[in-house]
Amino acid sequence: MKILVINVSLRPQSREKLFPIGLGYITTAMKNAGFVFDVLDIDAYRHSDQEVESFLRNNKYDIICIGCMVTGYKIVKTLSLLIKEFYPETIIIVGNSVATSIVNTLLTYTKVDIAVMGEGDETIVDLLETIHQGKPLDNVRGICFVKEGKMVSTAARPLIRDISKLPCIDFSIFDVDLYIQNSKISVSDPLPIPRDEVRALPVNTARGCVANCDFCYHVFKGVPYRYRTPGSIVGEIKSLIGKYSLNYINFWDELTLFSKKQNLELVQKILDDDLRFYWTGNCRANLFNSEDDIPIIEK
C-alpha cells in the first residue's frame, strides 16, 4: 500500500512551527508496525494551496491519513474534496479532535472515509492492517465510517493504561532540524538564555487532565488522567538531549504538573540522572499556592 500522512497548517501566517506531537505518536506507531509512508508536512514548509493541490494531483496514494484539531475542519474538508477529485478510490482516514468531536459532521459533509475516535496509537495500526488484508472494518475498534449509506460506530477501543510503555516519538520521521531551529520562537518569555541559543523539542508526560473545564475540549477529555513514570520521562529527555543537543524541553500536555508528590519524584529523578535543561510546562494555578512550593520548581 502507498500511504501518505498529512500535517496541516492551522496558522499559516504565524512564525511558530510547532511539532505535531500527536501525529508524531501515530506515525511512530505506523513505522514500528512496518508501514512505509510519505509525509506531507504543510505546516513545517508552509506549502501554498497551489503547491498542495499540485502534490496531490501528481502523487497517487492508496491511503491518506490526516491528523487535525477541530478548528481545522474546513482544511480537512477542502483536502478531502481535492483528494477524491483526483483519485476517488483513495481511502481518507482522519484522526484527532476533528474526528472525535464532530464525527457526524465530518462523515456527512466531507469526503472523509474513516474517522479514528480518541486515542489512535493502536487503532491506526489495526486499521491499516485490516485494509491491507482486505478484511471488513467492522471489527476494528475505535472507528466510525459510512457503510451502505449508514454511519457505523465500532466498539470503543480500551485506553492504553500504561502510557509509559508507549514508544517515544521518532522525530526523524519529520524534519526535526527545522523544528529545532524554529523552537526558539515558540518558547515563552522570560528566557533564561539568549533566544538564539534555544534548542527545544516537546516531550509528552501525560494524557488527559484531572479537571473537566466546560470551555476545554481535547481528545482525552472524559477519560482517566494517565501520567508516565519519572524514569520513562527522564529516559526520553536524556535520549533527546544526547541525540539533538537540546538545552530546552517543552512539556506539551493538557496538564503536566498535577500533584506535589509527582513533581518531587520527577525532580528527584532528573537530579539523580544529573540532567540540566530549561523547560516549560502546564499546571493548574492552585497547585503551587505557597512560597514553600517555589523550591520544587526552582530545582
Model-derived segments and their meaning:
Residues 4, 9-11, 140, 146-202:
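N-terminal [4Fe-4S]-dependent radical SAM core
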Residues 5, 66, 94, 117, ...:
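Conserved beta-strand positions
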Residues 9-11, 70, 255, 285:
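Residue-level signal for short, function-critical loop segments
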Residues 12-23:
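Glycine- and acidic-residue-enriched helix-capping/strand-helix junction motifs
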Residues 26, 52-55, 75, 79-83, ...:
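A general structural detector for well-ordered alpha-helical segments in enzyme core domains, enriched
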Residues 29-162:
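Glycine-rich beta-alpha loop elements in corrinoid/cobalamin-binding modules
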Residues 171-299:
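Radical SAM [4Fe-4S] cluster-binding motif and immediate context
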